[in-house]
Amino acid sequence: MSEDTNLVMFTIGGNDVNFSDIVKECFTLGLRDAKTCKEKVADANTKLESVKSNTLTILQKIDNKLKNDAQVILVGYPRLATNRNYILDNSGVRYDAGAGVRSLSDASMEIQSTLVQEWNKSHPSLKVTYIDGVINTFDGHEPDPSPKHRNPQRWINELLETEGKIKDNGQIESESSSDTNEFYHPNITGHAEIAKLIAEKVGVPTFNNQEPSTKSDIDIAFVIDSTGSMKDNVGALRARVNEIMKKQKKVPPRIALHSLTTRTTLSSTLKTT
């Protein structure tokens, strides 16, 4: 991240609370288990305070790096299930997984909202905007937790799909996918709805840097932390970056995309680059 960066937008915390384990143990047919799902959700709730602490540390490193007029936007998470009654009942354990996972998302929003308020009160040099409307905007558009159904108005990829986009009939159509990186992340329509929320709350970002005097090619690097939940998915992410590179080569100006694997944390990366 260069010192003249104008805008930083990010989500944070999902990997810290082992989001992928929750998807597997609570929603994936053949793997879901009431006892383990309950434990994973409870464990995630206990980690929310550490997520808050880690986020504040990262914001401090951003503040140390960027100019005072930079914009920082933290985007909240949607819930991961509709309010359909969804009970896991096996091995002598009965657990309301739907309610538990939705409650975790609500708690995450409260934590992030509080940390942004605390940050802005004590750090006048760098203000952070929190996009807190994601949960309400996505209400009714989350994945259907039942493996027997899909929510036809979902804005989040369910299992085994990607590229979900709303059609003229008001329903989502998607492509099949075995890439676990796509599951339970916003689909195309979901990303568009998040973009609307950002535009409504922040408007079009203003950039104060002067236009570069030369029209040189652009290099973009993806730095992947392979120590956490991404460690088993680095290959799939590299493949996706390569797909983007092939498409971009057909369109000027030339943009070079690189994927770099690192065993450092994000906070360390910000400190050393």
Task: Please annotate each region the language model reported.
Residues 41-49, 98-101, 179-186, 221-233:
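Second-shell loop/turn segments in exported
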Residues 48, 52, 56, 188-199:
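Short, amphipathic alpha-helical "lid/cap" segments that border enzyme active or binding sites
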Residues 22, 80, 85-87, 256-273:
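Short beta-strand-loop
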Residues 6-11, 16-18, 71-76, 128-132, ...:
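Structural recognition of the beta-strand scaffold that forms the well-ordered cores
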Residues 1-46, 79-90, 178:
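Oxyanion-hole/transition-state-stabilizing segment in secreted/luminal serine hydrolases
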Residues 51-91:
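Hydrophobic, aromatic-enriched interface-forming segments
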Residues 214-269:
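Von Willebrand factor
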Residues 82-107, 114-188:
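Mobile gating loops/cap/lid regions near enzyme active sites that modulate substrate access
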